[in-house]
Amino acid sequence: MTELSKYRNIGIFAHVDAGKTTTTERILKLTGKIHKIGEVHDGESTTDFMVQEAERGITIQSAAVSCFWNDHRFNVIDTPGHVDFTVEVYRSLKVLDGGVGVFCGSGGVEPQSETNWRYANDSEVARIIFVNKLDRMGADFLRVVKQTKDVLAANPLVMVLPIGIEDEFCGVVDLLTRKAHIWDDSGLPENFEIKDVPADMVDLVEEYREMLIEAAVEQDDDLLESYMEGVEPSMEDIKRCIRKGTRTLTFFPTYCGSAFKNKGMQLLLDAVVDYLPAPDEVDPQPLTDEEGVENGEFAIVDADLPLKALAFKIMDDRFGALTFVRIYSGRLKKGDTILNSFTGKSERVGRMVEMYADDRIEIESAQAGDIIAIVGMKNVQTGHTLCDPKHPCTLEAMVFPEPVISIAVAPKDKGGSEKMGIAIGKMIAEDPSFRVETDEDSGETILKGMGELHLDIKVDILKRTYGVELIVGEPQVAYRETITAEVEDSYTHKKQSGGSGQFGKIDYKIRPGEANTGFVFKSSVVGGNVPKEFWPAVQKGFGSMMNTGTIAGFPVLDVEFELTDGAFHAVDSSAIAFEIAAKGAFRQSIAKAKPQLLEPIMKVDVFSPDDNVGDVIGDLNRRRGMIKDQNAGVTGVRIKADVPLSEMFGYIGTLRTMTSGRGQFSMEFAHYAACPNSVSEKVVTQVKERKAAEAKK
């Protein structure tokens, strides 16, 4: 077993095409995990092992790989860069202790880089910055360093300087050692020499080295005082201070190179060892009660404590069902019985494996700090806590975003429904941001996801992996409804048909609630006109109706219901009577409260070459977009805008046409906003037409 202090659980984060997966490939090559390097553009990379990943040259799932460097164990997770798969980044951050943010030397801080960086900040994950592709045309290391300050509000700590640039890039100067690492053009990582700093770089190296040491010694008051008196700290003290500043997110050690040409990778791996934290150096995960509220206890990273582990990913592949697990406390052995605290059921651990992309090595045991996969777990889902049955506990839950887009699907073959249902069930277990439901009116199967590409990939997986050919409908937007006026009203439910009857009368107010509060129930009833025992029934009845609004049948958001008075009958009143009364109150009063249709607004981040900025902005305006910000860079302009999702279908094709293939964009859900009347009327008409067509079938 590796010592806990020598574990590094890290993720590789970047924008699409920044070289993230290639960087991972080079790490595996250098650590001896692979002998032939696979290239993303050839569809051969080790961590992009899905057919869809290989064909599209993007990472879709987070692939976990274990390897070793300088006696340290690395568990490396290569995460997706496309915004539609951000859920993979989110759940990876939940179980990582550190990360490497990869930025393109010419593209700089691109849209999805910013999103992933923000998520990592929220999770307080320590990071190293690696500026990749310095052999590319237009690459500029110091410009990208400045962008990380300006765009990400990061504090990059420059650790190396490049020697040469673009096609003349040949190596880097290590500022700490004042030594140049120069590679030949063979593309082999081991073919490098360590030399003195080139004469024309000496002054620049000394300038940046001084800034580096000043930033480092600020982490230690005694060292800072000595340094101010002219005493240079030892290499050991400098590294200790850099490690401290990295762990506290005070700064981010910044390196550069070319992963594709194997230049600069060894220094990056050394930095992971030297500066990123071990599992027991990060804040422990909080434990919660059954309601998800923190209870003041923590999952201390210690192999000698009772088992506490988090299932953070489910994957069904050619080997069977895999449950990826991060062990925070304790040990886990083959044959152990563990408790799933979410279901309350125990399960025996069969085979355990270390993952090597889509390959695996069977292991007998694992301990705190490990990221492993368990084969054949039956009742475990993403976010479930696995623990010692004698010491039950619950780790903080994983929360996933709500889908914003949906499509209706049906199997082409009449007998394919069961096959489709089984396949979709497996896919939902793997991806919590992918949902399915059945339309109550039409009986259609509705797939819901985070974007067009997300659902496109799911349909492709159903076809290729599970052999289910589908008829796919047009993408549908997840509209919502709300109210804009307060209504004071009364509703009586009375039923008498021999024997005991039903009676429940409620007086109430409904009003617009605060944004993102959903349904809020209050009671200001004084006295016993509506006994307290019936209040939950009123809440349940009204709340159950919030799934179907009165405008077009979309779910209703942000409504506050206040029960003010009412009446009951000693014999005929019951919980069911008051629940029915509350449902009637919804139908009666929502329509009076000036209901309004809401549409999802997306936060859109577009990169446009200078020549096409006017066209891009004009197109966003035509899509009802609101331009929020523009930032000019060396290679083009970043445009940020809020745009309705309904206007963004097919946008990538339009952008590529306008920019001759050079434009890029990302988008993520921002908020719901009121639809203009013209849009609302159009949506209502479409819903009516769809229901009429379904009724004729």
Curated annotation (Swiss-Prot):
SUPFAM superfamilies named among the record's database cross-references: EF-G C-terminal domain-like, P-loop containing nucleoside triphosphate hydrolases, Ribosomal protein S5 domain 2-like, Translation proteins
Positions that bind GTP: 14-21, 78-82, 132-135
Entry's Gene Ontology BP terms: ribosome disassembly
InterPro entries named among the record's database cross-references: EFG_II (IPR041095), EFG_III (IPR009022), EFG_III/V (IPR035647), EFG_IV (IPR047872), EFG_V (IPR035649), EFG_V-like (IPR000640), EFTu-like_2 (IPR004161), G_TR_CS (IPR031157)
A GO cellular-component term linked to this record: cytoplasm
Sorted UniProt keywords: Cytoplasm, Elongation factor, GTP-binding, Nucleotide-binding, Protein biosynthesis
Coiled coil: none
Pfam families: EFG_C, EFG_III, EFG_IV, GTP_EFTU, GTP_EFTU_D2
Keyword Protein biosynthesis: yes
Compartments it resides in: Cytoplasm
GO molecular function (one): translation elongation factor activity
tr-type G domain segment(s): 5-280
General function of this protein: Catalyzes the GTP-dependent ribosomal translocation step during translation elongation. During this step, the ribosome changes from the pre-translocational (PRE) to the post-translocational (POST) state as the newly formed A-site-bound peptidyl-tRNA and P-site-bound deacylated tRNA move to the P and E sites, respectively. Catalyzes the coordinated movement of the two tRNA molecules, the mRNA and conformational changes in the ribosome.
Family: Belongs to the TRAFAC class translation factor GTPase superfamily. Classic translation factor GTPase family. EF-G/EF-2 subfamily.
Full protein name: Elongation factor G 2
Gene behind the chain: fusA2
